[in-house]
């Protein structure tokens, strides 16, 4: 005998299935890396203030679909659709909603908002708004929006994201001093193409995971986050075509500050000294911070100098010019976090450009990346057309407002709190 479920339970289950199905129908989006909270031990020695220079987005792999929000008067109203459907107390209306949604999908796009759906069955959408957020996305743009990472609906910046950026900066500095080692790994045919990145990291840090000295660098998740969050619009600027393509909407932090705690154990600097042939022996927080600053800014400066050689939109160019001037003041750490930093901020590619003015290694690098592109025709064609380091990457994701490119994404300034 079949078990009879309560009406509301059936409806809740049905709406969950409906949302999952619609999300699959509309578009399948690759999951971004999940960021996990970095648990920090007691005995923190440094408090660092972080200030946004340009908008930042760190994703959690989830999105707001058109079933989750509607935009009105410059605000995105986030709604609880499951609660609304549960309140209907009528399976026929649930089925009506399902049919309405399916019949309004055109070219993989849903031409309805959550408000349209609720009003179609006599519900007041404002009764189900769980929060509001400023929106720079126009109300007629029915689109999916990438979610900012959060825990229990509270935004945060993962310490792991900052630590990862510092790790990349260190690897850059290591090969800046040991370029022949980098070239040897790239040349080594015994190392599989897709393993070369990992091998570069292991060679610079440790081939034995338990001996990874970055375990001595501990960074907390954001504390006292005071930020302005909005639905924002980004687009990819195509350097060759000198125009925009591929719009991406996201929930971004556009302004604000937050604090982090950093603990650096002595073993971290002992390993840095061994690897970089330095003689660091910091006795206080200021000296420890200065060492991190030198590592990070050497990398960030090279990235920005590379970016300034590219054909950027006017306001983006000005943003980079100011950023470079600020880095040269040498009074803070400058890092790029999250989405939009792209290829340059996640690899040692700018290092090759920096150390190869005569393009002696470029053909080798080009061949390597053509091979790594595999079945990605667009990526392969981009490399086939590249005649210099500056010909790649071919696109750059930038923050767009009122149809103008305003700034690159993800840059922060970090200062020591005394």
Swiss-Prot record:
The protein's superkingdom reads: Archaea
UniProt keywords, alphabetically: Antiviral defense, RNA-binding
Q: What is this protein called?
A: CRISPR system Cms protein Csm5
Q: Could you give a single Gene Ontology term from the biological process aspect?
A: defense response to virus
> What family does this chain come from, according to its entry?
Belongs to the CRISPR-associated Csm5 family.
Q: List the disulfide bonds.
A: none
Q: What does this protein do?
A: CRISPR (clustered regularly interspaced short palindromic repeat) is an adaptive immune system that provides protection against mobile genetic elements (viruses, transposable elements and conjugative plasmids). CRISPR clusters contain spacers, sequences complementary to antecedent mobile elements, and target invading nucleic acids. CRISPR clusters are transcribed and processed into CRISPR RNA (crRNA).
Q: Which residues form a coiled coil?
A: none
Supply the source organism for this entry.
Methanocaldococcus jannaschii (strain ATCC 43067 / DSM 2661 / JAL-1 / JCM 10045 / NBRC 100440)
Show the InterPro entries listed in the entry: CRISPR-assoc_Csm5, RAMP_III_fam
């Amino acid at each position: 005998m079949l078990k009879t479920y309560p009406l509301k339970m059936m409806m809740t289950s049905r709406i969950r299935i409906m949302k999952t199905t619609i999300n699959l129908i509309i578009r399948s989006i690759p999951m971004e890396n999940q960021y996990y909270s970095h648990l920090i031990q007691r005995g923190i020695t440094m408090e660092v203030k972080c200030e946004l220079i340009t908008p930042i987005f760190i994703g959690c792999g989830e999105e707001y679909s058109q079933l989750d929000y509607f935009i009105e008067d410059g605000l995105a109203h986030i709604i609880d659709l499951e609660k609304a459907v549960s309140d209907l107390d009528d399976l026929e209306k649930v089925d009506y909603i399902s049919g309405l949604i399916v019949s309004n999908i055109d070219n993989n796009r849903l031409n309805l908002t959550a408000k349209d759906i609720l009003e179609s069955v006599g519900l007041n959408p404002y009764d189900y708004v769980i929060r509001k957020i400023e929106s720079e996305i126009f109300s007629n743009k029915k689109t999916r929006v990438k979610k900012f990472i959060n825990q229990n609906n509270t935004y945060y910046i993962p310490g792991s994201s900052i630590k990862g950026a510092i790790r990349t900066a260190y690897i850059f500095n290591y090969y800046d001093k040991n370029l022949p080692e980098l070239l040897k790994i790239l040349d080594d045919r015994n190392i599989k193409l897709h393993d070369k990145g990992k091998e570069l990291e292991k060679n610079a840090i440790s081939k034995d995971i338990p001996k990874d000295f970055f375990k001595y660098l501990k960074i907390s998740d954001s504390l006292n986050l005071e930020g302005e969050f909005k639905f924002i619009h980004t687009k990819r600027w195509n350097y060759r075509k000198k125009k925009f393509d591929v719009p991406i909407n996201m929930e971004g932090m556009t302004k604000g500050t937050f604090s982090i705690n950093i603990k650096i154990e002595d073993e971290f600097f002992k390993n840095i000294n061994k690897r970089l042939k330095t003689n660091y022996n910091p006795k206080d927080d200021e000296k420890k911070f200065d060492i991190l600053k030198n590592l990070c800014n050497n990398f960030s400066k090279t990235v920005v100098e590379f970016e300034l050689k590219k054909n950027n939109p006017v306001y983006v160019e000005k943003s980079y010019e100011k950023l470079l001037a600020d880095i040269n003041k040498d009074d803070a750490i400058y890092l790029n976090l999250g989405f939009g930093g792209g290829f340059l901020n996640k690899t040692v590619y700018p290092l090759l450009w920096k150390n190869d003015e005569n393009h002696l290694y470029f053909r080798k690098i080009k061949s390597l990346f053509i091979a790594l592109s595999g079945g990605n025709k667009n990526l392969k064609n981009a490399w086939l057309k590249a005649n210099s380091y500056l010909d790649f990457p071919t696109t750059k994701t930038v923050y767009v407002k009122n149809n103008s490119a305003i700034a690159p994404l993800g840059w922060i300034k970090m200062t020591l709190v005394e």
